[in-house]
Amino acid sequence: MKRAFVTVGTTSFDDLVARVVANDTVQILKSLGYNHLVLQIGRGTVVPEPFSTEPFTLDVYRYKESLKEDLQQADLVISHAGAGSCLESLEKGKPLVVVVNEKLMNNHQFELAKQLHKEGHLFYCTCSMLPGLLQSMDLSTLKCYPPGQPEKFSAFLDKVVGLQK
C-alpha cells in the first residue's frame, strides 16, 4: 500500500487541502500507485470527509501530538513550506513536495523551498501547479538531506530573514 501524507502544520492552508482532495489530484495519485492519502489539516475550514473504497482510502485529522508515525509510513510527503515540517520530512529521508502558499509569497518559506530544491532535496510548487508537478516529477532524482547539520540550516535562515549578510 503506497501512502501519501499531506501536512499543513499548526496553521491552516485550505487551498492546499482543497487542491489535494480535488478529483484530478486524487486520480493522479492513484495513477502513481498511491492508494492511501492521509491529510493533517490544522485549523483549516476545508474539512474533507474521510472515506475508504477499493482501492483508495482518505484519512483526515487536525492535529496529533506527533507526526512521526505518519511520516514514517509515508512514501511521499506533500507539505506546506514551514521550516519544521520540511526538515522533519527530509531528515526522515522521505520524498518531499513542498507547496508554497501563494498568499505568503513574501516570506522566508518560499526562499527555503527554492534553496532546498536547488540543492536537489525536494520539489516545490504552488497549489495550482501541484497536479502537473506530481505527474512530471522523478523522485529518484532527489538527493538525501544530510542529517545533523542544524548550524548550516540556522545560518541559511539567518541570511534569508536578514540577520546575517
Curated annotation (Swiss-Prot):
<dbReference type="GO" id="GO:0048167">
    <property type="term" value="P:regulation of synaptic plasticity"/>
</dbReference>
<protein>
    <recommendedName>
        <fullName>UDP-N-acetylglucosamine transferase subunit ALG13</fullName>
        <ecNumber>2.4.1.141</ecNumber>
    </recommendedName>
</protein>
<dbReference type="GO" id="GO:0004577">
    <property type="term" value="F:N-acetylglucosaminyldiphosphodolichol N-acetylglucosaminyltransferase activity"/>
</dbReference>
<comment type="function">
    <text>Catalytic subunit of the UDP-N-acetylglucosamine transferase complex that operates in the biosynthetic pathway of dolichol-linked oligosaccharides, the glycan precursors employed in protein asparagine (N)-glycosylation. The assembly of dolichol-linked oligosaccharides begins on the cytosolic side of the endoplasmic reticulum membrane and finishes in its lumen. The sequential addition of sugars to dolichol pyrophosphate produces dolichol-linked oligosaccharides containing fourteen sugars, including two GlcNAcs, nine mannoses and three glucoses.</text>
</comment>
<comment type="similarity">
    <text>Belongs to the glycosyltransferase 28 family.</text>
</comment>
<dbReference type="GO" id="GO:1904262">
    <property type="term" value="P:negative regulation of TORC1 signaling"/>
</dbReference>
<dbReference type="GO" id="GO:0005737">
    <property type="term" value="C:cytoplasm"/>
</dbReference>
<dbReference type="GO" id="GO:0098554">
    <property type="term" value="C:cytoplasmic side of endoplasmic reticulum membrane"/>
</dbReference>
<dbReference type="GO" id="GO:0043541">
    <property type="term" value="C:UDP-N-acetylglucosamine transferase complex"/>
</dbReference>
<keyword id="KW-0256">Endoplasmic reticulum</keyword>
<dbReference type="Pfam" id="PF04101">
    <property type="entry name" value="Glyco_tran_28_C"/>
</dbReference>
<comment type="pathway">
    <text>Protein modification; protein glycosylation.</text>
</comment>
<dbReference type="GO" id="GO:0006487">
    <property type="term" value="P:protein N-linked glycosylation"/>
</dbReference>
<dbReference type="GO" id="GO:0006488">
    <property type="term" value="P:dolichol-linked oligosaccharide biosynthetic process"/>
</dbReference>
<dbReference type="InterPro" id="IPR007235">
    <property type="entry name" value="Glyco_trans_28_C"/>
</dbReference>
<dbReference type="InterPro" id="IPR039042">
    <property type="entry name" value="Alg13-like"/>
</dbReference>
<keyword id="KW-0808">Transferase</keyword>
<comment type="subunit">
    <text>Forms with ALG14 the active heterodimeric UDP-N-acetylglucosamine transferase complex.</text>
</comment>
<keyword id="KW-0328">Glycosyltransferase</keyword>
<keyword id="KW-0472">Membrane</keyword>
